[in-house]
C-alpha cells in the first residue's frame, strides 16, 4: 500500500488549537466497523455504547514538561532542549536547538543555575545524549522550569499544563499526551464504572516518533520508533477475564491499542510484561486483543491513520474522515473523538 492512499483534504482551521473547557463535551463520531454506518454524538454519550461485559483499557502515562529553555554556559547563547528518552537516571536522549552549539563537552545552564547539563554523546537522527546536574528531585525541578512539549501543529500557548494530561495520568515519562484519554472526566469514569464496565490501566510512554511523518512511498518500508510500555498482573487478568466472558476489550487511544497488540498472543491473551515496542499496525494486520477503539482524528498520511484503517477498513475510515471534515469536526490532539465499534 502507498502512503498517498491515506491522504485527505484537511482545512487548517479544523486543527484544534486549544482543549475543550469541558473535556467530555467534545463531539464523538461513532463508526460501525462492520457496516461503515456513522452516528454523530457528544463524547459523554460513549456511556450508551458500553455494556457491563466491556473493559476499557487506558494509558496512565503522564507528560513530562520536557521542553527546557536555557543558555550555553560559555557564551550565554539561548538554547532549547527537548527531552526524548531517559537512558539512565540523569542521562537523557535530547533534541537540542541550535544543534551546532551542542557539541560533546558543551555545558548549559537553566533557570538560576538550579539545573545544569553537559552533552556527553551523540544520539540517533541528530539528537544528543545529555547528562543533567542538580540538587534535589529532578521531576520537581523539571516541573518548575519545563514547558509542555506541544505538537508542532498547535501554535497557541497552553494556559494550564493539566489540560494536556489525562485525569488518570500517573506514570511520568511521555513527550506527548495519549490524547484520546483527554476526553474523560472523573465523573464520566465514575458513571462508566457504575454501569459495570471494567477499567484497566497500562503504561506506554509516548515518544516524538508519534509526530514524525512517513517518508517512504510504500508503507511496508516504514520503521517505527520504539516506545517503553508496561502492563501489570491486575490489568492482564481483567483483560483476559473480559475475553473469556465474551466482552469487548476497548482500547482508549492508539497507544493502549499498540501496547495490547504488542503483548497479545495468537489467542488474544495478555500477560504481565514490560519492554520496548516498535509495532507498526496497517491494513492487512489482524487484531488479536482489541475489539473496539476510542481515538482522536489523525493527521493525513500518518501511521495512526493506518492503524485505525486496519481496524475498521480503509474505505470506512476515509469515508468517515471526509464526513468529519464536511461536518467541521475538530482534528488532532485537542480535537474531537471517534469511537470505532
UniProtKB/Swiss-Prot annotation:
Record pathway: tRNA modification; tRNA-queuosine biosynthesis
Keywords attached to this entry: Cytoplasm, Queuosine biosynthesis, S-adenosyl-L-methionine, Transferase
Is Cell membrane set as a keyword in this record?
no
**Which protein family is it in?**
Belongs to the QueA family.
Q: Which GO terms describe its biological process?
A: queuosine biosynthetic process; tRNA wobble guanine modification
Q: Which reaction does it catalyse?
A: 7-aminomethyl-7-carbaguanosine(34) in tRNA + S-adenosyl-L-methionine = epoxyqueuosine(34) in tRNA + adenine + L-methionine + 2 H(+)
- Got a GO cellular component term for this one? cytoplasm
Function as written in the Swiss-Prot or TrEMBL entry:
Transfers and isomerizes the ribose moiety from AdoMet to the 7-aminomethyl group of 7-deazaguanine (preQ1-tRNA) to give epoxyqueuosine (oQ-tRNA).
Q: Does the keyword Cytoplasm apply?
A: yes
Q: Which domain of life is it from?
A: Bacteria
Q: List the disulfide bonds.
A: none
In which compartments does the protein localize? Cytoplasm
Tell me the protein's name: S-adenosylmethionine:tRNA ribosyltransferase-isomerase
On assembly, the entry states: Monomer.
Q: Which InterPro entries match?
A: QueA (IPR003699), QueA_dom1 (IPR042118), QueA_dom2 (IPR042119), QueA_sf (IPR036100)
Q: Which GO terms describe its molecular function?
A: S-adenosylmethionine:tRNA ribosyltransferase-isomerase activity
- Any idea of its EC number? 2.4.99.17
Amino acid at each position: 500500500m502507498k502512503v498517498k492512499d491515506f491522504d485527505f483534504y484537511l482545512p487548517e482551521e479544523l486543527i484544534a488549537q486549544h482543549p475543550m473547557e469541558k473535556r467530555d463535551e467534545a463531539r464523538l463520531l461513532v463508526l460501525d466497523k462492520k457496516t461503515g454506518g456513522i452516528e454523530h454524538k457528544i463524547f459523554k454519550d460513549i456511556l450508551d455504547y458500553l455494556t457491563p461485559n466491556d473493559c476499557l483499557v487506558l494509558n496512565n502515562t503522564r507528560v513530562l514538561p520536557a521542553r527546557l529553555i536555557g543558555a550555553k554556559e560559555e557564551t550565554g547563547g539561548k538554547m532549547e532542549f527537548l527531552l526524548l528518552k531517559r537512558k539512565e537516571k540523569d542521562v537523557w536522549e535530547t533534541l537540542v536547538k541550535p544543534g551546532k552549539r551542542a557539541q560533546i563537552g558543551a555545558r548549559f545552564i537553566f533557570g538560576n543555575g538550579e539545573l545544569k547539563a553537559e552533552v556527553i554523546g551523540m544520539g540517533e537522527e541528530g539528537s544528543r545524549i545529555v547528562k543533567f546536574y542538580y540538587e534535589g528531585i529532578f521531576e520537581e525541578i523539571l516541573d518548575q522550569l519545563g514547558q509542555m512539549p506541544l505538537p508542532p501543529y498547535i501554535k497557541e500557548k497552553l494556559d494550564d499544563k493539566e489540560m494536556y494530561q489525562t485525569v488518570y495520568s500517573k506514570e511520568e515519562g511521555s513527550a506527548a499526551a495519549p490524547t484520546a484519554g483527554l476526553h474523560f472526566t472523573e465523573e464520566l469514569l465514575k458513571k462508566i464504572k457504575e454501569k459495570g464496565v471494567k477499567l484497566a490501566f497500562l503504561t506506554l510512554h509516548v515518544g516524538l516518533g508519534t509526530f514524525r511523518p512517513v517518508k517512504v512511498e510504500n508503507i511496508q518500508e516504514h520503521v517505527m520508533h520504539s516506545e517503553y510500555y508496561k502492563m501489570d498482573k491486575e490489568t492482564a487478568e481483567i483483560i483476559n477475564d473480559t475475553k473469556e466472558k465474551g466482552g469487548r476489550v476497548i482500547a482508549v487511544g492508539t497507544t493502549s491499542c499498540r501496547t495490547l497488540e504488542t503483548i497479545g498472543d495468537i489467542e488474544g491473551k495478555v500477560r504481565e510484561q514490560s519492554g520496548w515496542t516498535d509495532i507498526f499496525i496497517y491494513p492487512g494486520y489482524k487484531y488479536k486483543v482489541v475489539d473496539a477503539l476510542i481515538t482522536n482524528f489523525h493527521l493525513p498520511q500518518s501511521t495512526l491513520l493506518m492503524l485505525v484503517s486496519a481496524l475498521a477498513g480503509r474505505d470506512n475510515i476515509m469515508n468517515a474522515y471526509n464526513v468529519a471534515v464536511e461536518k467541521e469536526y475538530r482534528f488532532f490532539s485537542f480535537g474531537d473523538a471517534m469511537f470505532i465499534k
